[in-house]
């Protein structure tokens, strides 16, 4: 129906870019997007909690780092279903979120490196904590004035 509307209004498919054509062809309904958002978000919470539970097992730091990182990636991917992957990536790298995004992604990678390759448990835990803090700071950027409120709260506690 959309193609018919474009043809009738004088717009050709050739005017539409390749990316727009691909996104048009693979777009999901709102209900489907909402369902997959919930599935990914719940999976992210589940993996994060599972990873936290595995932390207390002998040699569980590796599993903790993997599952905690997998949980954060699933939670991050869940928002791609709500706003679309291209829009999500554009928003992630806006100037207001750029630093938080870079730190978050680096912490995701360094958590896995510390746990799996470097075999440094303390470093893996440190990167998981930094991963949590950077993910929280990144998430707060979507709520108007939330970062300012957190900064004021922290500064009043520290002074």
From Swiss-Prot:
Principal place of residence: membrane
Residues that bear Phosphoserine: 9
Alphabetized InterPro entries for the sequence: Vesicle_transpt_Got1/SFT2, Vesicle_transpt_SFT2
GO cellular component, one term: endomembrane system
Gene Ontology BP terms: protein transport; vesicle-mediated transport
Protein topology in the membrane: Multi-pass membrane protein
Record flagged with keyword Transmembrane helix: yes
Lumenal side: 58-62, 119-122
Any matching Pfam family: Got1
Functional summary from the UniProt entry: May be involved in fusion of retrograde transport vesicles derived from an endocytic compartment with the Golgi complex.
Similarity comment: family membership: Belongs to the SFT2 family.
Protein name: Vesicle transport protein SFT2A
Source organism of the structure: Rattus norvegicus (Rat)
Organism classification: Eukaryota, Metazoa, Chordata, Craniata, Vertebrata
Gene symbol of the encoding locus: Sft2d1
């Amino acid at each position: 129906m959309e193609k018919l509307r474009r043809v009738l209004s004088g717009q050709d498919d050739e005017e539409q870019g390749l990316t727009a054509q691909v996104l048009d062809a693979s777009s999901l309904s709102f209900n489907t997007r909402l369902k997959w958002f919930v599935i990914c978000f719940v999976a992210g919470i589940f993996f994060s909690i599972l990873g936290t539970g595995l932390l207390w097992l002998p040699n569980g730091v590796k599993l903790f780092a993997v599952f905690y990182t997998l949980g954060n990636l699933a939670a991050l991917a869940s928002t791609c279903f709500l706003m679309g992957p291209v829009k999500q990536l554009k928003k992630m790298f806006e100037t207001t979120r750029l630093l938080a995004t870079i730190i978050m992604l680096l912490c995701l990678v360094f958590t896995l490196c510390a746990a799996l390759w470097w075999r440094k448990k303390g470093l893996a835990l440190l990167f998981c904590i930094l991963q949590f803090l950077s993910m929280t700071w990144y998430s707060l950027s979507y709520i108007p004035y939330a970062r300012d409120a957190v900064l004021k709260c922290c500064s009043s506690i520290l002074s």
